[in-house]
Amino acid sequence: MFISISAGVVTFLITLVGIPAFIQFYRKAQITGQQMHEDVKQHQAKAGTPTMGGLVFLIAAVVVSFLLALFSKQLTNNVGMILFILVLYGLVGFLDDFLKVFRKINEGLNPKQKLALQLLGGVIFYLFYERGGDMLSVFSYQVHLGIFYIIFALFWLVGFSNAVNLTDGIDGLASISVVISLSAYGVIAYVQGQMDILLVILAMIGGLLGFFVFNHKPAKVFMGDVGSLALGGMLAAISMALHQEWTLLIIGIVYVFETTSVMMQVSYFKLTGGKRIFRMTPVHHHFELGGLSGKGNPWSEWKVDFFFWGVGLLASLLTLAILYLM
């Protein structure tokens, strides 16, 4: 347990020191920074804010986790594959950010390129992590999926990777939402006695808390796709490594809601010839523009943050209650 806590503290301190250095480098190199393409007026002031800050906490968490797991003889297959997903999905995000920031290609990687790399990572993860005989845990039941488990695994990894990416739309929202989700999985890992996975979880929590110091409103840096895609993949990988896949639907309700809002909006728009359900999606922008109803007073970013964090916290507590109190 001491090693796991140490991982979190060390990663927190590295990120706390690393982010200011990253921002300073960004400014000195006169890199353009974040481009704003959203129809939210208050976001236009964010244009030029350094992005790709996720690179700092990602490298810190991966290196610290690897070294401490190696030192404490906890470098298991599961740890290795969770770190692999962090690195590969982080690389996909890095390439996406690089094309946007340095090559001025607004869409970054095209969807097919991004999906191909994410699927490749998913296949490798499936082949090498310690899976439970292709069994899918649903509450207290075990469903044998056989060869179809790989389809589920790919859907889970790619889906939640992109879902967290959609959530990263206002200052601090994604970073603390993921801290809450990881904290719930930290409890599950501890109860299961999987201290190896707990080490990686606490390392990333430390990195995200260090990052949040500079990412809360008004954000001095954004995590970019390099951070958000890696974090989403990590959550999916951890849920599978702990054999509690179903829990991510509740623990990750914020990401599910964000993604569902986009799917509903696009479908309804096409079916009705231009009508919308929400003012704007992902749905956090709907609240920014007009509160819960979309027609009321606009919510500040802090208010949206606390609302979503509250939902995520309640969902995480509900999941733990279902697992251990019912």
Swiss-Prot record:
Cofactor(s), by name: Mg(2+)
Catalysed reaction equations from the record: UDP-N-acetyl-alpha-D-muramoyl-L-alanyl-gamma-D-glutamyl-L-lysyl-D-alanyl-D-alanine + di-trans,octa-cis-undecaprenyl phosphate = Mur2Ac(oyl-L-Ala-gamma-D-Glu-L-Lys-D-Ala-D-Ala)-di-trans,octa-cis-undecaprenyl diphosphate + UMP
Keywords assigned: Cell cycle, Cell division, Cell membrane, Cell shape, Cell wall biogenesis/degradation, Magnesium, Membrane, Metal-binding, Peptidoglycan synthesis, Transferase, Transmembrane, Transmembrane helix
Pathway assigned in UniProt: Cell wall biogenesis; peptidoglycan biosynthesis
EC numbers: 2.7.8.13
Alphabetical GO biological process terms: cell division; cell wall organization; peptidoglycan biosynthetic process; regulation of cell shape
GO MF, one annotated term: metal ion binding
Chain ranges passing through the membrane: 3-23, 51-71, 79-99, 115-135, 138-158, 169-189, 195-215, 221-243, 306-326
InterPro entries: Glycosyl_transferase_4 (IPR000715), PNAcMuramoyl-5peptid_Trfase (IPR003524), PNAcMuramoyl-5peptid_Trfase_CS (IPR018480)
GO cellular component, one term: plasma membrane
Protein location: Cell membrane
Bilayer disposition of the protein: Multi-pass membrane protein
One Pfam family linked to the record: Glycos_transf_4
Cell wall biogenesis/degradation recorded as keyword: yes
Record flagged with keyword Zinc: no
Enzyme class label: transferase
Family: Belongs to the glycosyltransferase 4 family. MraY subfamily.
Function: Catalyzes the initial step of the lipid cycle reactions in the biosynthesis of the cell wall peptidoglycan: transfers peptidoglycan precursor phospho-MurNAc-pentapeptide from UDP-MurNAc-pentapeptide onto the lipid carrier undecaprenyl phosphate, yielding undecaprenyl-pyrophosphoryl-MurNAc-pentapeptide, known as lipid I.
Name under which the protein is recorded: Phospho-N-acetylmuramoyl-pentapeptide-transferase
Naturally occurring in which organism (per UniProt): Streptococcus pneumoniae (strain CGSP14)
UniProt lineage: Bacteria, Bacillati, Bacillota, Bacilli, Lactobacillales
Encoding gene (name): mraY
